[in-house]
Regions:
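RNA-binding accessory domains that recognize and position tRNA/RNA substrates
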Residues: 1-157, 168-172, 178-179
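Cysteine-nucleophile active-site neighborhood
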Residues: 159, 165-201
Length: 201
């Protein structure tokens, strides 16, 4: 985070947008110890500790941002100060996990809402408020894991299909892309596109 002081408002579970925090580290310049907000339930430090997210403070985050802007993606790790250099280098040499969607997608199918219109949602890391917003438009949602087959989604006979947003680079998700292309060859999916029903995302 490039803002110089982070955590001024604290945190409130009411505003959580996922079942957990999926980021693996938090780098900031200064962490606020005494947040001021009438809705604050806990400090940012308490929240991150509960989520097992390591925090690095006292860092010139704007300088890091300039380096990333100039050089692109760079490998980095957050480690204890006493960790031997050879162990740090071993961690830096660990191959990067490219399929971030696999870590954030729902592990199982679930439903939300009881509206008139049945919408199949492919979860690539969707935020909770998007689901709630869709459900508020008289929709009944069936949320599928990212790697669900086209056949299984179409078997649910949805009125529409929503492709959720998520982290990572789409080029790292070729299996999903190919499955969607296959999906588009299905007669029912063609029917969705040609009728008053919809597919978006």
């Amino acid at each position: 985070m490039t803002y110089p002081l982070v955590g001024n408002y604290g945190t409130n579970d009411l505003f959580n947008q996922g079942r957990k925090s999926f980021f693996q580290g938090y780098v900031i310049s200064e962490l606020c110890d005494h947040p001021s907000n009438w809705r604050c339930e806990k400090t940012l430090e308490q929240f991150l500790d509960e989520q097992d997210v390591p925090v690095l403070t006292g860092v010139d985050t704007r300088a890091i941002t300039r380096k990333l802007r100039n050089y692109g993606v760079l490998q980095g790790v957050i480690v204890p100060a006493e960790m031997p250099q050879e162990e740090v280098e071993k961690l830096l040499a660990t191959p990067e996990v490219h399929d971030q969607v696999a870590t954030v997608t729902t592990p199982e199918i679930y439903t939300l809402g009881n509206g008139k219109y049945h919408v199949a949602v492919m979860d690539f890391g969707i935020k909770q408020n998007i689901l709630e917003y869709l459900a508020s438009f008289d929709c009944h949602l069936t949320v599928f894991p990212a790697y669900t087959t086209a056949e299984e989604i179409l078997a649910a006979r949805p009125d529409g299909i929503f492709l959720a947003n998520g982290p990572g680079d789409p080029k790292d998700l070729q299996p999903i892309i190919e499955e969607l292309k296959a999906d588009r060859q299905e007669a029912y999916f063609r029917h969705l596109l040609r009728s008053s029903n919809f597919s978006f995302g």
